[in-house]
Amino acid sequence: MNIERKILLNPGPATTTDTVKLAQVVPDICPREKEFAGMMKQLRDDLVRVAHGDLSKHTAVLFCGSGTINIDICLNSLLPADKKVLVVNNGAYITRAVEVCEYYGLPHIDLKFSVYELPDLSVIEKTLSDNPDIALVYTTHHETGTGILNPIREIGKIAHSHGAVFVVDTTSSLGMIPFDIGKDNVDFCMASAQKGLQAMTGLSFIIGDESLIRASRDYPKRSYYCNLYLQYDYFEKTGEMHFTPPVQTVYAARQALDEYFAVGEEAKFARHKRVFEAIHKGLQELGLQYAIKREWQSGLVVSVLYPDDPLWDFDKVHDYCYERGFTIYPGKISTTNTFRLCALGEIDVEDIERFFEVMKSVNTVLVNK
């Protein structure tokens, strides 16, 4: 089968291999069969390995949904009664956690920092000291809206010193840059299959401390479908999801994980890094600037400032690139006009070099006409 290859420079879903795409073409199977349950058990264990977890302590719980379902699940499931959430917020995707808290009516503090900077650890420390009822601290590892990489190891240490559970959204970092759930002081991390693993959309997962999941059994029940303990318990008792899983998507995730381990994480990390460097090289050649300090960037997403040109039109540039096989994406900084270029997915330096050849021509054809 000849599948046209598209280069996705958006922050997910990412460009995938044909073998992952074709892994979805399998004989029909009832997801309650032991064969399928066995595959999901191995998948869960392998996801823990991706996060460098300890299988005697950590587990992975699968859910059907986009990555945002994980935020919903962790916040509504892991907060005890009469306790509070602290959201360490320096970006648009972290703000989703604030919105989840608002929708559930969860007591919370939205600790806002500039989207251009790292969170101030001393302010986090003081906030926890002043609010002993905070039981859960939440932030994002890689804030995809800007490309900034947050100091989760340091934040986790502070959270634990105050007896709080530390939950981190690793949707746009897990499997692409170094992460160790234990060494990074993280109790729960989360991701979706279509980003770092380069699988298909529709399957998400939470990796975390089993003892903390079991403790949450007696917490207030705020959701039926999106309850972490309920899904975990059903997996432990039956090997199955509580409700119908995305069967073909699970097969694609299995193939993607096989490819992840075959390549090896160090080689995969190195590829993402050289793609990121190629993006910066291309931006420099075009004279385009980025919004976040280079030393704070994740190595995966670059927020690019619009050029100082009244003729610049992002929509036209997007469409021009899209017609030539490349997808670029709008920025998420409300105060500044930006677009994003990402080093996610099954792409390499040659793809980026071809993209910037297109960008050089778009400057001539669209911007300067």
Per-region residue spans from a language model:
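Conserved PLP-binding catalytic core of the aspartate aminotransferase-like
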Residues: Q289-Y320
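Conserved N-terminal alpha-helix of the aminotransferase class I/II PLP-enzyme fold
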Residues: A23-I73, A92, R96-V100
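PLP-dependent enzyme catalytic core of the Aspartate aminotransferase-like
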Residues: M1, T338-K369
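Active-site C-terminal subdomain of aminotransferase-like
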Residues: T15-T16, Q194-H280
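Active-site phosphate-binding strand-loop segment of PLP-dependent enzymes
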Residues: P119-G175, F188
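Conserved active-site segment immediately N-terminal to the catalytic lysine
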Residues: G182-Q194
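N-terminal "arm"/small-domain region of PLP-dependent enzymes with the aminotransferase-like
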Residues: M1-K34
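Conserved PLP-anchoring active-site segment centered on the Schiff-base-forming lysine
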Residues: L79-T95
